[in-house]
Amino acid sequence: MDNRFSNIFNLTEDQAIALFKQPLDIEDGTSERYVGAAHLINFPTERSIKALIEAVEDRDPALANRIARRKAVESLGRLKATQALPTLKNCLGDTDPLTVENAVWAIGEIGTEDESLLQAITNLLTQPHQTYRVIIQTLANFNYLPALKKIASFTNHDDKSVASAAISSVARLNDDYSHMPAVAEFLQSDDINVRRACIQDLIDAEYYPAIASMAKAPISVAFRLRGIRLLAAKGLASEKITFATIEPHLDRIIRDRPQDIDLVHEYDQPPSLDFLIRELYHTDFGRCYLAGKTLLEIYPQEAPEALLSTYQEEAHNDYGAHFHVVKLFGLLGYQPSQDLIVEALHNTSPQFQKSRAAAAISLGNLQSQPAIPLLKQTLDTPIFDLKYACLLALEQLGEDCWSEVINDRNLLIKAKAAYKLDPQTA
């Protein structure tokens, strides 16, 4: 789990516990309790775990306390606090569904062989208003076969993210993957949450036939890249797939051209330029990709100025739109954007990380020879997608740097380098 923001306030253990135990009736008590609960994950001590358990056992019905309890439950899971399992088991009967959800997840993180605990989780599948997806995933991760029949009853659930988890879990528990194509089809769902969710289910089932569809799914590059990286790691280790199988799809994700995406949306009439620019700010990346593709097709002459204008006004501070704008400048071949793209390449703010890889690809698309030294310097980065993008861009600029990363610590960069130097190795 990404812990970059876990201790952004630099709290000590004493300070975190003090915040966590603030009375509910003081000013800002709500947020302070929550912050304290969140920050105790930085201190895997008996004292912190005891404080978190005490917080979970405090059943004051006030909203502030309920919110803090949920976070305390989550923190116990992240700390893998086995001594908290009895307390977490009691949470399975809580009237707050979000507390129940967090308790199930936390038990999954901690691990258990307690049959009564696993059965208690299974029984939640018969109760209304529960987060069935998390329950199903947790039971499958425990390989708990007694839950199979109950899980199977959710394979046609109205909530397709639940159905996806159920189909994937049944496949894993039964060792029968004949119905997994249905999960891959969810990559084309109208619901962005279903598209995102099924990526995890394809990973959990180690369903390699979905790699090509995953690479073209209309969701954020971060979801697709995570999916293919985890599947590749498992598949290469088990020798169920080769790097040659993965390479074109991995390259497609890193290049992330909207014309390579299998879109789920369409326009009933040609949209205006202003409308397409606004669509780049949408949280559903499927709509962003459709807008980008349409900009390239209908407004190749007008788009650069419009993109530059929206960048200066708003996109420079919106990490989603920033990513699309940086990428589109390269695809449009807009040479005046080079300084802006170089700035994006060097932007180390975590929320703009995707834009750094997009910037590298754009510099390659712009055939920017002056960028070659900058791209080579950036090869020192530990960030996978940025390094991979720099290597692709350098290759596009006539610079073969694969021999320099043949011993890279990242599995896929090392495999790519070996494949480029000797295709027979894959």
Give the location of each predicted region.
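Amphipathic alpha-helical scaffolding segments comprising HEAT/armadillo-like alpha-solenoid repeats
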Residues: N10-L24, F43-D60, A81-G93, T112-L125, ...
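Short inter-helical turns and helix N-cap capping residues of alpha-solenoid HEAT/ARM repeat scaffolds
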Residues: E27-G29, D60-N65, T95-P97, Q127-T131, ...
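Non-membrane alpha-helical segments in proteins
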Residues: S31-N42, I67-S75, N102-W105, L290-K293, ...
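Residue-level detector of extended alpha-helical repeat arrays and alpha-solenoid scaffolds
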Residues: E32-R33, N65-R69, V100, Y132, ...
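Conserved hydrophobic register position within alpha-solenoid helical repeats
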Residues: G36, A72, A103, I135, ...
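Non-catalytic interaction/regulatory modules that flank or connect domains
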Residues: Q200, R229-L230, D274-E313, N317, ...
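Alpha-helical adaptor scaffolds
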Residues: Y319-I361, P373
